[in-house]
Amino acid sequence: MWSRLAGTVASLTMAFGTSGCALFERTLEPGAILNDCKGCPELVVVPPGSFDMGAPGGEEGRPEGPVRRIDIRAPFAVGRFEITNAQFENFVDATGYAPAAACGVWGAGSWQYPEDANWRDPGYQRPPMPDEPVACVSWLDAQAYARWLADRTGLAYRLLTEAEWEYAAKAGTRTAFFWGDDPDQGCLYANMFDLSGAAKWGFDWEPVDCDDGFAEASPVGALQPNAYGLHDILGNVWEWTEDCYIAPYLDSLVDGSAVQSDGACDRRSVRGGSWITRASRHRTTFRGRDPEDTVFSFFGFRVARDLTAEERQRFSGSKSQQ
């Protein structure tokens, strides 16, 4: 009997692998990587949890408070990387979508808005690479891409809410940046305005005292991720979020959902800083805000999606407490 059983187990192992996924549902762990279709962005499973959102201070006119406890009640999936030029090109080619133009680019010592500056030519003074994050895209462009992914896959693709973004960026930390409090230690993790950027662009603000070797956008994943496995969540390009920007924060909204406006929303929240951005604006609590049709050479995005009911059932991680 036992020899027959052993032979059966061996046959099953050869047929299905050691996971036995044909017989048992594989659990879905935090950090698991999902990919829903050819050309779709890789997603990382982020666990539910609670965290303190915001900071008691902030730059003048950019309040980051009041600090309040946010409860992310369900696991969700976040883009492992920012959306790349190649991925955005697939969307444009498939749909005929016309993204925003007249992108803000730096030239002749000031910001210029030429009609031919767009995501295909974001003003780097060199061609953008396919594996670099798409830039010169508006909030409206980011929404259009997410809707296309949702239609293509039948899954709930979207932008991150501002609360989800901060939770995912912190990845269990309480320091100013997910690597610590010293921005000069950040060149392993975030493409900020550094010594390479200062040498090429000569902006007035002080660079971080380190060098990642990139004077503008870097290939996604070139630098190290945070503890949740997310690359470039700080730096590279600013990331549009779903929220209508409201300051100070609403005390009543503590479940991680997006702030929505009853009428027209004049500004959307952007997060994370960029290759051109001074160090302080890469803090995980820092809030940017811009009109939803804004396009600059340092604005991009990453996507998120809700897990399906079946994926939530398979999720086996514990709740994170930050």
Question: Could you tell me what each predicted segment is?
Answer:
Residues 297-311:
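Short, structured beta-strand segments at or near domain termini in extracellular proteins/domains
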Residues 35-112, 116, 130-141, 235, ...:
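A short glycine-rich, aromatic-capped structural motif
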Residues 1-9:
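Bacterial N-terminal signal peptides that target proteins for export
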Residues 52, 56-58, 98-288, 295, ...:
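Functional-site microenvironments in short loops/helix caps that host divalent-cation chemistry
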Residues 23-27:
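Bacterial lipoprotein signal-peptidase II cleavage site
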